[in-house]
Amino acid sequence: IEIPECEIDFKDINIDSHPEEHPGEPKKFQLEWDKFKLWDLKMKNTELVERAYSMASYPAEGKEIMLNVRIATPPWDRNANSWMNVNPGVASSYIFSKKPGDKVTISGPFGEFFINESEAEMLYVGGGAGMAPMRSHLYHLFRTLKTGRKVSFWYGGRSKRELFYTEHFKALEKDFPNFKFYIALSEPMEEDNWTVKDGLDGKGDGFVGFVHQTVIDNYLNYHESPEDIEVYFCGPPLMNQAIEKMADDFGVPPENVRFDDFGG
């Protein structure tokens, strides 16, 4: 996406939540923006720049392009209890400032994060904003191709407040018996009321721990032929490194390991 020369005042940003994603909670993010004084921030961009984002939309959605963007704030000055005098993220500030009907310039898609055409089992792992290409792949696999391949998606976050699209994937799981969706929280909060699943088919919300270790402990250690699985992943750099090592440890050949390294 292109970011032209511009100045963005965060006071002008509309943070009302999406009615389809957060029904009945239009001011869901207001408290957090108030608490951290995001309204005081200003972004100034002095030259035309481009930033790359993973696409969350899939081909059947046509010209509708969906991006998952996390606002990039300056470092926090603990002594002053305020943001440091550093420019906020140029691209995220620009995107957050856009309103329905505004025009932007986008090119692509680029990259090599493609679905391998085979009948092999597919294991997806996503973390944080790495949800974007997961949605694109999985919606294309099931909503368009109606695939019969065995597929699982393991999604990791610190707490429930970091999760999104979960209801969409739970619906996908109900529609397709060959798809399983699991969540792992590394630091569940008290208000999450997180109940730990007793095994893959047990009751509960999900697992506790880092998502790569959750996959190992609950699935790959019991799999008859993990080396035959295709592994797809996208997330923060440390998660990506852990998944790459996991795949190698279980004998998955490099050509069957694919990732979208948005954090690199």
Task: Please state what every model-predicted region is.
Residues 1-99, 158, 184-188:
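Ferredoxin-reductase
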Residues 94, 107-119:
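A short, basic/flexible loop-to-alpha-helix module at the beginning of a structural domain
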Residues 114, 133, 242-246:
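Phosphate- and divalent-cation-binding pockets in alpha/beta enzyme and binding domains
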Residues 119-120, 143-151:
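Conserved S-adenosyl-L-methionine
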Residues 131-145:
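Histidine-anchored nucleotide/phosphate-binding helix
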Residues 150-264:
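Reductase modules of NAD(P)H-dependent flavoproteins
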